[in-house]
């Protein structure tokens, strides 16, 4: 192959002909062009490196896979630096490097031809070396000498290649070094003993690869077409990336020896042999295996943290690209819009692919396989270590036994020698003794002979034991050696498996990272080149060109004098800061003087006062006349006309002045006050002004809203409002724009007070502000629950939503009595009431009465149990009832010692719980259930250091028993005090008159007795009305009741008012009423027909939507607080 390439090169035109044809000749180093700033020229005297530079020893071996790119950075080598020799593609004659003093002359010099011949001679020597290597490896004879001979031929070929690359650095390319590394690996791994065809094919392929790579590089070098991106130029003096790194350390300028070639990678058998020969080889191998496990753990930790960062970066990039894409793509004609649109898409694709790649790395290719391999590695290492230590312990025991047997054997031999000496001595003494002493000497001799025989036997036994221990020690030693061989082989196998796993995982990781990051430079370069093509102002011109607008019309300015149409306008007389229904006259009377339109029909004269302080608040709007009792108002009642109002602040309010055609005011007017002088629920007008398009809550519609001008604190969410805020012109309430949907504080038409610390405060402080001693929060919650939640299943037992409960508590502290509860959940309201009572520092039933009340409950339970035991199977429950009555009597005596406000609030709350119990079939709340709920709340011991004391846990049933008894026997416990109402009630009204109303369609024998709920006894008498929201109830009521029954109901309502002197409250319109106004109404309509009272009450009994109609009820009989109704239907009477 090399000979054919040589002949082709000889046929190519010479360098001189190229120069004469116009090809550039070698130029001085100072004139060499720079290519993109990456190829620097070093003005050295020669391309050949100094001789001493080749003597620098390189460490390690450099092996590269054959699939690497031609780019130098892909092989792990940096591009040529400032001190490296590089040459661009424009240099056609790279054979010699002209120094500044040796500039080439015209034509082809003789040195050029000599360089070509020298290069071709070196290439021929390299080809011969490869041929010798091929013959040595593939020959079939001399099996023992083939390996060293092959390594010698390989070293000779690499030495020639190293000399060529040292002389011509431009030949040092990635392909050449990669092919050389592959050839070295194949030669070292070749099995010369076995005739394996697969290994021969791989060796021949590696040999052909290096020949093709080197010949191609030489051909490109001679043609001047060497690609600078494939060079591996090494700075002078740095040989760590040169040819020496392919085959390890060597001598200066000499090829490596056979030992140096073999030191790179020893066969597995040789590694085991080396470890077997050295002392502590198994321990060294085990230590390496242990360190390798730690190394894998560190690798996993590093890659896990790195992939986590990659994942976070990819997700963050996706997020910002997705968020910015919407805003960037809004305007169509922006500069470089397509560039950044493409960049955002590339970022999204990169982030998506990176997330997938990281997930693959974590689950499939790197972390999971490496983790499993580490665990298996540690398991096998520990097993091998245990087997090795077990073999060592056996050998140590054998050696110990051997030492003991040797000592015993030596001792027995010494004893035997001593016995033989004594026998010999006795024989000599016997021989030299006198004839008369022969018997004694004979006995002594016999004795010593016996001792000598015993010592001989013991010595023989010790020798046998010694020999056995020696044989056992040899056996254990051999077993240890066998275990050593097995352990070393297993350790190497485990290490090789772990190496293979690490290798495959690493290749997969970096290959995947290369696949992810390789397109990025191309994308960035493409974006850069595309950005260079943009002309400033191009997109702006395109935008202007696409605008399709009409020609701008000519405008003329002329002076127009003002002509006044009227001398008086009702709008000019409007008050500045607040709204009054009389400020705007009817549209027909716009030109009339003030005397004619000052007071309209149906509007009191006091309503025309123009000051805010003189405004009179009414509970019902006056837009519906007294005679209009239908659900649909007449044409004159519903036609309103809006007039714009000029505010002193320059802002629009949320409600506008509404005037009906008859002059009646359609805006909010109020006539009666609540605890603080304001009604808790105000009529709602149609929203308008700056917040008319917002979803306003029922309470928010009562405010006159304008835009917030200064930062303030939101009364709904208790955070500061800086932008997009609203405030009320009358009560100065500030609120976020978004909080208007859930605002629960109504307008009080005067400046709202600061926040009240309500929860957790002393009960006497809250009760001091109430005339009857019942705090407003208790009244609000109880009235709302009685209005619409008496029959709610699980009331007080089911908890509300925590967030809504907290907002309600905050609303009570901010708005006090002005909190709107009609849109709140009944369970939330009941939870607020329980929370208020639970957070009192001292409960309603004082601490000092706790032990007495609990003691009464214990005695009552004990007595009831004894009564049940005494009655045995009898059905009579009089004993239990007597026990309960006795307990109620004693409770009445104890509760007299409570403070007045505590007793009043407790009576108010128990009356409410009594009403809940009366409908327990619907709400499932029995007195026992309510006792369980309110027992620990109303009656608890004095707090101690423990969070929940044991005694309080034990007393829970007794607390529930006390509250259950108070609910069941409410009339007995509080019989001495009449029920009081906020409107006032005389004690003499305890006795009720008996009212009998005949029902025309009921039979005499059918009578049903209903308990009359004492709704007039407290501040929130419940009125039953029929709303448009329940069409079925309205139809049923209209079918059952006639006009005559409604007339009878009118007389009945006024009779009940005279007997109890209690004011009626309208549940749909407001929670409290004014007794004086009802009495005044009764006086005004008392002389009319019998439908007058009912119609007068129904005129005022309207809710915020003016869609409520009174429902006539069946006639009834009142006797002592109970109602007797002659009806065959179980129908509860309803009052209007």
Swiss-Prot record:
Query: InterPro entries attached here?
Result: AH/BAR_dom_sf, C1-like_sf, F_BAR, FCH_dom, GMIP/FCHO2-like_FCH, PE/DAG-bd, RHG29_45_N, Rho_GTPase_activation_prot
Positions marked as site (Arginine finger): 797
Listed CDD domains: C1_GMIP-like
Q: Which UniProt keywords apply?
A: Cell membrane, Cell projection, Coiled coil, Cytoplasm, GTPase activation, Membrane, Metal-binding, Phosphoprotein, Zinc, Zinc-finger
Residue ranges that the Swiss-Prot or TrEMBL entry lists as coiled coil: 376-412, 440-499
Annotated Rho-GAP domain ranges read 761-974
Q: Where is this region: Disordered?
A: 1-73, 91-110, 583-662, 1061-1136
Q: Where is the composition biased (Low complexity)?
A: 646-655
Q: Domain F-BAR: where?
A: 269-539
Question: Where found, per UniProt?
Answer: Cytoplasm; Cell projection, Ruffle membrane
Q: Which GO terms describe its cellular component?
A: azurophil granule lumen; cytosol; extracellular region; membrane; plasma membrane; ruffle membrane; secretory granule lumen
Summarize the protein's role: Contains a GTPase activator for the Rho-type GTPases (RhoGAP) domain that would be able to negatively regulate the actin cytoskeleton as well as cell spreading. However, also contains N-terminally a BAR-domin which is able to play an autoinhibitory effect on this RhoGAP activity. Precursor of the histocompatibility antigen HA-1. More generally, minor histocompatibility antigens (mHags) refer to immunogenic peptide which, when complexed with MHC, can generate an immune response after recognition by specific T-cells. The peptides are derived from polymorphic intracellular proteins, which are cleaved by normal pathways of antigen processing.
Q: Which PANTHER family does the entry link to? A: RHO GTPASE-ACTIVATING PROTEIN 45 (PTHR15228:SF18), SPERMATHECAL PHYSIOLOGY VARIANT (PTHR15228)
> What the record says about its domains?
Rho-GAP domain is able to regulate RhoGTPase activity, actin cytoskeleton and cell spreading. However N-terminally BAR domain plays an autoinhibitory role.
Query: What more does the record tell us?
Result: Infusion of lymphocyte from mHag HA-1-negative donors results in a durable remission in mHag HA-1-positive patients with leukemia or multiple myeloma.
Q: What is this protein called?
A: Rho GTPase-activating protein 45
What organism, scientifically named, is this protein from?
Answer: Homo sapiens (Human)
- Gene this protein is translated from: ARHGAP45
């Amino acid at each position: 192959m090399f000979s054919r390439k040589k002949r082709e090169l000889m046929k190519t035109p010479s360098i001189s002909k190229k120069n004469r044809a116009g090809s550039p000749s070698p130029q001085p180093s100072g004139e060499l062009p720079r290519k993109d700033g990456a190829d620097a020229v070093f003005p050295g005297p020669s391309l050949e490196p100094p001789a001493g530079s080749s003597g620098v020893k390189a460490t390690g071996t450099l092996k590269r896979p054959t699939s690497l790119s031609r780019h130098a950075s892909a092989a792990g080598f940096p591009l040529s630096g400032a001190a490296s020799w590089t040459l661009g593609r424009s240099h056609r004659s790279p054979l010699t490097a002209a120094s500044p003093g040796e500039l080439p002359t015209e034509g082809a010099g003789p040195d050029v031809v000599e360089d070509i011949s020298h290069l071709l001679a070196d290439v021929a020597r390299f080809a011969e070396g490869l041929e010798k290597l091929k013959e040595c490896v593939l020959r079939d004879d001399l099996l023992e000498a083939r390996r060293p001979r092959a390594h010698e031929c390989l070293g000779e070929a690499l030495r020639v290649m190293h000399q060529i690359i040292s002389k011509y650095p431009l030949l040092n390319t990635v392909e050449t070094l990669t092919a050389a590394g592959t050839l070295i690996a194949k030669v070292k791994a070749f099995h010369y003993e076995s005739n394996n065809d697969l290994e021969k094919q791989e060796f021949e392929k590696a040999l052909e690869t290096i020949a093709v790579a080197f010949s191609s590089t030489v051909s490109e070098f001679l043609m001047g077409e060497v690609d600078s991106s494939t060079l591996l130029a090494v700075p002078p003096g740095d040989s760590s990336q040169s040819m020496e790194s392919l085959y390890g350390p060597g001598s200066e300028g000499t090829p490596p020896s056979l030992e140096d070639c073999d030191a790179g990678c020893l066969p597995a058998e040789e590694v085991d042999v080396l470890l077997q020969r050295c002392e502590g080889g198994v321990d060294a191998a085990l230590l390496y295996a242990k360190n390798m496990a730690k190394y894998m753990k560190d690798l996993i930790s590093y890659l896990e943290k790195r992939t986590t960062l990659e994942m976070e970066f990819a997700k963050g990039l996706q997020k910002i690209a997705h968020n910015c894409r919407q805003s960037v793509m809004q305007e169509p004609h922006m500069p470089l819009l397509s560039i950044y649109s493409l960049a955002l898409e590339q970022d999204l694709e990169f982030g998506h692919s990176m997330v997938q790649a990281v997930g693959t790395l974590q689950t499939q290719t790197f972390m999971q396989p490496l983790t499993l391999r580490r665990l298996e590695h540690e398991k096998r290492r520990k097993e091998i270590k245990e087997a090795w230590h077990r073999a060592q312990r056996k050998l140590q025991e054998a050696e110990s036994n051997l030492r003991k047997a040797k000592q015993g054997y030596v001792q027995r031999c010494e004893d035997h020698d001593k016995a033989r000496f004594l026998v010999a001595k006795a024989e000599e003494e016997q021989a030299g003794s006198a004839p008369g002493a022969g018997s004694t000497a004979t006995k002594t001799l016999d004795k010593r002979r016996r001792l000598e025989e015993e010592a001989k036997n013991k010595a023989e036994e010790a020798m046998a034991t010694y020999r056995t221990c020696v044989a056992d020690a040899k056996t254990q030693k051999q077993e240890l050696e066998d275990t050593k061989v097995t352990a070393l082989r297993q350790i190497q196998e485990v290490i090789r498996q772990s190496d293979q796993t690490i290798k495959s995982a690493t290749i997969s990781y970096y290959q995947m990272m290369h696949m992810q990051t390789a397109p990025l430079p191309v994308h960035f370069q493409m974006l850069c080149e595309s950005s260079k093509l943009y002309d400033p102002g191009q997109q702006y011109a395109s935008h202007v060109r696409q605008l399709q607008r009409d020609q701008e019309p000519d405008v003329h300015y002329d002076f127009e004098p003002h002509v006044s149409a009227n001398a008086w306008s009702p709008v000019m007389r409007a008050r500045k800061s607040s709204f009054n229904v009389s400020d705007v006259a009817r549209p027909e009377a716009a030109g009339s003087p003030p005397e004619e339109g000052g007071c309209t029909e149906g509007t009191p004269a006091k309503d025309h006062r123009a000051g805010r302080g003189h405004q009179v608040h009414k509970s019902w709007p006056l837009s519906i006349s007294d005679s209009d009792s239908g659900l649909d108002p007449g044409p004159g009642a519903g036609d309103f006309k809006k007039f714009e109002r000029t505010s002193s602040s320059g802002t629009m309010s949320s409600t506008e002045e509404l005037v009906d055609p008859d002059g009646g005011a359609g805006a909010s007017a109020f006539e009666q006050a609540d605890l603080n002088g304001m009604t808790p629920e105000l009529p709602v007008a149609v929203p308008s002004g700056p917040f008319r398009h917002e979803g306003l809550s029922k309470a928010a519609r009562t405010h006159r809203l304008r835009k917030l001008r200064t930062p303030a604190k939101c009364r709904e969410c208790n955070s500061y409002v800086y932008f997009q805020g609203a405030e009320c012109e009358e009560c100065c309430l500030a609120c976020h724009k978004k909080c208007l949907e859930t605002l629960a504080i109504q307008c009080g038409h005067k400046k709202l007070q600061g926040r009240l610390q309500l929860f957790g405060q002393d009960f006497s402080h809250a009760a001091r502000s109430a005339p009857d001693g019942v705090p407003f929060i208790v009244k609000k919650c109880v009235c709302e629950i009685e209005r619409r939640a008496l029959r709610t299943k699980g009331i007080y037992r089911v908890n509300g939503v925590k967030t809504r409960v907290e907002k309600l508590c905050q609303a009570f502290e901010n708005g006090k009595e002005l909190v709107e509860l009609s849109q709140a959940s009944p369970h939330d309201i009941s939870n607020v009431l329980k929370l208020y009572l639970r957070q009192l520092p001292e409960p309603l039933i004082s601490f000092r009465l706790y032990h007495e009340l609990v003691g009464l409950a214990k005695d009552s339970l004990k007595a009831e149990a004894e009564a049940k035991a005494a009655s045995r199977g009898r059905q009579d429950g009089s004993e239990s009832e007597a026990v309960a009555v006795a307990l109620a009597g004693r409770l009445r005596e104890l509760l007299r010692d409570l403070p007045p406000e505590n007793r009043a609030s407790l009576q108010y709350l128990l009356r409410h719980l009594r009403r809940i119990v009366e409908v327990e079939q619907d709400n499932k709340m029995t007195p026992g259930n309510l006792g369980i709920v309110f027992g620990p709340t109303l009656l608890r011991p004095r707090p101690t250091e423990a969070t929940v004391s044991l005694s309080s846990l034990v007393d829970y049933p007794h607390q529930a028993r006390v509250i259950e008894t108070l609910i069941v026997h409410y009339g007995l416990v509080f019989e001495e005090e009449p029920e009081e109402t906020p409107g006032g009630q005389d004690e003499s009204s305890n006795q009720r008159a008996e009212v009998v109303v005949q029902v025309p369609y009921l039979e005499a024998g059918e009578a049903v007795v209903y308990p009359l709920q004492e709704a007039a006894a407290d501040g929130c008498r419940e009125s039953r009305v029929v709303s448009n929201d329940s069409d079925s109830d309205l139809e049923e009521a209209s079918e059952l009741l006639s006009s005559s029954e409604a007339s009878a109901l009118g007389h009945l309502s006024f009779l009940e008012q005279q007997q109890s002197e209690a004011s009626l409250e309208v549940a749909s319109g407001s929670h409290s009423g004014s007794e004086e106004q009802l009495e005044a109404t009764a006086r005004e309509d008392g002389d009319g027909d019998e439908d007058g009272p009912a119609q007068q009450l129904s005129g005022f009994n309207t809710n915020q939507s003016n869609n409520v109609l009174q429902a006539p009820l069946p006639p009834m009989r009142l006797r002592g607080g109970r109602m007797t109704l002659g009806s065959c239907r179980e129908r509860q009477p309803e009052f209007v």
